[in-house]
Amino acid sequence: MIRPNMFALLMLVVLAITSVNADCPKVKRDVCVIGGGAAGMSIATLLKDRGYDPVVLERESVVGGHCNTQYFDPPEGETVDWIDYGVQLFMNTTQLNLTGVGSWSLATDKFAERFIGPNATLPLEGNDINLYVNMETGELVIPNVNETALNNALGVYFYLLSMYPWTSDGKYTGTIPPELLQSFGDFASPFGLNAMAEIFRAFGYNSGIAYGNYTNLPALYMLNAASMSVMQVLLGPSTTTFKVKGGCYSVYRGMSDYLGSENIVLNATVTELTRSFFLSTKSPRLRGYTTRADGSTDNFEYECEKVVVAHPPTLDDLSYVDLTQNEQDLFSNVEVAYYYAGVADISSSYLNGNSFQVMNADPSSEYNVPFGPGLISLGRYVDYGPTQIQAISNTNLEVCDMLEIITRDFENIPSWILNSFDIKTFDQHKEYAPHFNLASLSNPVSPYAKLAELQGSNNTYWVSALNRYTAATAHVWDEANIIVNTYFPSKN
């Protein structure tokens, strides 16, 4: 027999559950997209194109992921009022397809202009001033570039790339060739590629994935980071790479307008994703909460026909998912790089009125780059306004610790180059450049093949910079387009 006080307690529990459900009504969606970066926003727009009604859940207060843009008041008569300090350049896949460099399903130039407007793509321009400084000693470093050796090295390197043509677009799920599992420093040494130090610097060190003598990453990843398609930035016509008018964020602002604010949930923390297994017909359930400016929270719950996980799938970031054993085994092999970026105001009688890049250099390194952690570079593409700053670490440092290191680096830049500086914003790019570790790459069945096999299992799809071998936006957008075209039949 239930005692009266026990019955009252049960009623309180029922009322509590009912009140929670009343405050948090379940919303049904055909697709729930977790993550509002390049992968999540692009796949959501492509899904809407095909008649779907996606919702995007983003943990930050803005969408765009690694696409960071700061706006400022330009001098009178000038029109550029932005500086990108995350993603700055886009590969033009229309031009790459025309020249036979890779096979791309989505035209990045048309895709960007769709959300910004016509004539929104801008050609890449060089800097007025490029300097190399050892930011530990303050010494000015003059790169030793031998044109003959460089041309010979380029010929050898292009031949090497021709042996792995899939590096141009990263669409490869076969067994990784064993020679590409060497560190890039060891792989490159017999071929005399040191003459390409400045080129590898651009795609290795400057991009935040490699440092020192490039022994920290397999050759596989450097060949993809400096693939024939990416190399067009330096060697191809100006039309093969572009910037965008209004800065990188303008692309994602346009995507947000297309999707509608009611379909984008910002400051969203997903706490639980429960999916259907085996013969169950239940749809995935997704729960979490949003955080307001005052710190208060609101719960949400979605019933989703399909779920797209559109952020790098590290185990730490998948704690909310009821992972299968296969998923857990695969994603336990995912690693990330430690990259930081921000914006600073500077004063410099030497640099004022110029576009420039001041790069950290270490002449004791074979590739003239430091071993980290520290500042990579500071620079801007126009001759006025604030400066973007980049930094790299070989360990996962807290932002405050990294800020202390780069402040020291700034202070070591000679005063004739830099008079003063004021760092305005600085943060870590979390889950940057996700990649599979060396042990998993050594298996006969590539982890990229295993990732491809997971698509659609348990009504879940995975798209992020992990799907290809490099984290360029063109690769992410292209992968999103392929997944939508392959697994989501048009509802129109």
Curated annotation (Swiss-Prot):
Main location: secreted
Subcellular location: Secreted
InterPro entries according to UniProt: FAD/NAD-bd_sf (IPR036188), Flavin_MAO (IPR050703)
Signal sequence, renumbered to the chain: 1-22
GO CC, one annotated term: extracellular region
Listed GO MF terms: oxidoreductase activity
Glycosylation sites: N92, N97, N119, N146, N213, N267, N458
Pfam families xrefs: NAD_binding_8 (PF13450)
Keywords attached to this entry: Glycoprotein, Secreted, Signal
Name under which the protein is recorded: Uncharacterized protein R656
Organism: Acanthamoeba polyphaga mimivirus
Lineage: Viruses, Varidnaviria, Bamfordvirae, Nucleocytoviricota, Megaviricetes
